[in-house]
A protein has these predicted regions:
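Helix-loop boundary and gating motifs at the non-cytosolic
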Residues: 12-63, 220-256
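Conserved MFS/SLC helix-loop-helix module at the cytosolic interface between two early adjacent transmembrane helices
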Residues: 67-104
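Helix-to-loop junctions at the C-terminal end of transmembrane segments
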Residues: 69-81, 266-281, 371
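Structural signature of the two symmetry-related core transmembrane helices
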Residues: 84-98, 180, 282-300
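Cytoplasmic helix-loop-helix junction between adjacent transmembrane helices
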Residues: 111-151
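Symmetry-related core transmembrane helices of the 12-TM Major Facilitator Superfamily/SLC fold
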Residues: 173-191, 379-396
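C-terminal transmembrane helical hairpin of 12-TM major facilitator-type secondary transporters
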Residues: 282-332
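A late C-terminal transmembrane helix in Major Facilitator Superfamily
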Residues: 344-373
């Protein structure tokens, strides 16, 4: 007798209770802090009347210090347990919700930075928890795409919230303070995941290598590209300011935030499981669709702003940037989970987050300074460096393919 064949749609096997808990935590976290990130440049520049370079400095401090917290978070999580560290860091993020309660820009930037550093501390551990929840390498890109979709989907809803709040002239202090609620729900949701506990180090395997063995050929290329992309990974506040200033409408800036977040979320959700399971294929798509796509998007914004082509062209450029971001946020951690597996996953994720943060420290500072000279020059710089990141990743594909074949 032949076994019966199940019919009808089936739930993806990797979409377990732990994956849902981690992904919903990401949704609520972005729903909270992305509302602050969307409104903070408007609060600092338009309400407190501070120059744009101060916003660039604030972003640089957040990401620069965040690099240290990311790197330390990966290592500490490997020693003490990723679940405990992720919960502790997540619980401190609401500091940034308090930044509009003060009129002093130094205190406002300090509160924003403190909450962001807590986010950086927990981010590598949250990624490791997802890796442990999805043991099959071939399912990782789909899982990280799902995480990114809910993550950025929360950010898109945050944009809707800020847009509606500004439309009814709600003060920034109340807009930001209300974000404490979803941030607390984020920590509650993360606590329902039961992976990421403290464990003894795994025995070295072919993918993680022995302590003295050189890392896989793609690992250094991935970290270098992540850092270079970080040099162009300006805070989302810059597109918000660009569209608001280019169109002369404050609400259009928040609309740009919504376009970027929604495009990025849909990309992760729809394409996450279709981007390949092997590291060589993932690297090729990361370089072409991710980094080079980001270069194209920044170029469109630079050209559209410089030639005064109107709101539609600016939003097209922002949408391309969002698409590229969805590819990058899905494939970077998925590739690293293969290159650095087992007990080295935390260090690999920490190094990846740190590389991005170091680059972003420079990127936001450069964008803030160049933005004051020429908006088109700032985005032209971003396009050039993102293109270089894409080339570095694509050059590593042949050697990575050989490494994966010989494993």
């Amino acid at each position: 007798m032949k076994p019966s064949v199940p019919t009808g749609p089936r739930r993806a096997p990797w979409r377990s209770r732990d994956v849902w808990a981690i992904s919903l935590s990401a949704f609520f976290a972005d729903l909270g802090y992305q509302a602050v990130l969307a409104g903070f440049p408007l609060f600092l520049v338009l309400t407190l009347h501070r120059p744009v370079w101060e916003y660039g400095l604030a972003s640089s401090l957040s990401y620069g210090g965040g690099a240290l917290f990311s790197y330390a978070g990966g290592r500490i999580g490997d020693r003490l347990g990723h679940r405990s560290l992720a919960l502790a860091g997540n619980a401190v993020i609401p500091l940034l919700s308090l930044c509009a309660l003060v009129a002093n820009p130094v205190w406002a930037i300090g509160l924003l930075t403190g909450g962001w550093w807590a986010r950086n501390l927990r981010s590598p551990s949250r990624r490791v928890m997802l890796v442990e929840a999805v043991p099959a390498d071939e399912d990782r890109s789909a899982a990280f795409g799902f995480l990114h979709a809910l993550d950025v989907g929360g950010g898109a809803l945050a944009g809707v919230y800020v847009l509606a709040a500004l439309a009814v002239h709600l003060a920034f202090r109340w807009i930001f303070l209300a974000t404490v609620v979803p941030l607390v729900l984020s920590t509650v949701s993360l606590s329902r995941a039961h992976v990421g506990g403290r464990r003894v180090a795994d025995a070295p395997d072919a993918s993680s290598g022995s302590p003295g063995e050189a890392p896989p050929p793609g690992a250094r290329a991935l970290l270098a590209a992540a850092a270079l992309y970080g040099f162009t990974y300006y805070s989302v506040g810059f597109p918000v300011l660009t569209v608001a200033q280019g169109s002369g409408r404050l609400l259009a800036g928040i609309g740009a935030f919504l376009v970027l977040q929604a495009t990025s979320a849909l990309t992760g959700y729809l394409l996450g499981g279709r981007l390949g399971s092997g590291p060589a294929g993932q690297f090729a798509r990361l370089g072409l669709l991710g980094y080079l796509g980001a270069a194209v998007g920044a170029g469109v914004v630079a050209f559209g702003y410089g030639e005064h082509l109107g709101l539609a062209v600016l939003l097209i450029g922002v949408a391309v940037i969002g698409f590229a971001l969805g590819i990058i946020e899905t494939l970077e951690p998925a590739a690293m989970s293969v290159l650095r597996s087992g007990s080295r996953t935390g260090r690999g994720m920490g190094a990846l987050s740190a590389a991005r943060s170091v680059g972003t420290f420079v990127g936001n500072l450069a964008m803030g300074l160049l933005y004051g000279v020429s908006v088109s020059l700032a985005y032209g710089y971003a396009a050039g460096v993102a293109g270089l990141a894409g080339i570095i990743v694509l050059v590593a594909v042949p050697s990575l393919r050989r490494w994966h074949r010989d494993r």
